[in-house]
Amino acid sequence: MPAVCGVTPRSFSPLCAWKTSCIVNRFVDAAAQARSLEEVDHRPWPLPNRSWRMGQTWQRLLFAHWRVPHDALRPHVPASLELEQCDGSAWLGMTPFRVAGLRLRGVPPLPLLSSFYELNCRTYVRQGERPGIWFFSLDASSRGAVEAARRTYRLPYRHAHIDAHGAEFAARRRDGDGSFDATYHAVGTAAPAEPNTLEHFLVERYCLYGGDGTLRADIHHPPWPLQQAEATVDQDGIAPVELEGDPLFHYAERQDVVVWSPESLP
């Protein structure tokens, strides 16, 4: 039999098996990202008439959302963007998750660069007829991802130390200015959010805004396989405003995503 990873089957080591599994998983993720383009009927507008730039797979996502008064959040959003409301208020979300299979179009996922942990803090905006996401901050455990996203998408990425094991996720910004701790698990079965519901408003978003509201990047994914979640969350210095009341929790096990290059807005 042929050797694998430079060893014969008899001497196949656990480390070699892990490396082989990682390689296989990266290509499985890449195939799933491409397949996401086969399902488009749920989109609020057509796919861009140009090639996407980047693929990602997101894993073990918690969506934690707080009601925030519109007037409290409005000063933290560029004037060129409309701060959206649903069920009588604006909403601020925090989402911890794992990025896997990160790759540029036509390029295989690169070891050590394709997987990392991330926490984003966001709200929901629109310009014209395009509802999307505005990020207050994005904390990532990969310095390379932080630098690339800052440069290309002009997003407020920050480098953080992130420890994630099973149901636990802990993030500490490298500069010491902010921390986040969560324990969470899914409850019930996964299903897409129904149109015209709060859940649909919070998760079914197909573009992001960057720069000072001067850039927009389209994204695409299948409808979110959303579940209810039970969680405890403690954050310090991540949200730009004081958070009050109990958050809403939702969970998704996985999502395959493609992202287009940003375009300048008029």
Residue ranges and their predicted role:
Residues 2-11:
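Extreme N-terminal basic, low-complexity initiation segments
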Residues 3, 80-85, 131-132:
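Short amphipathic alpha-helical segments with coiled-coil-like heptad repeat character
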Residues 11-14, 264:
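Short linear/disordered segments characteristic of secreted peptide precursors
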Residues 25-103, 248-266:
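Hydrophobic, proline/glycine-rich low-complexity stretches
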Residues 32, 43-44, 108-111, 115, ...:
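Active-site-adjacent core segments of small-molecule enzymes
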Residues 86-92, 99-138:
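A glycine-rich, hydrophobic loop/mini-helix early in the fold
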Residues 120-266:
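Internal, well-folded beta-alpha domain core
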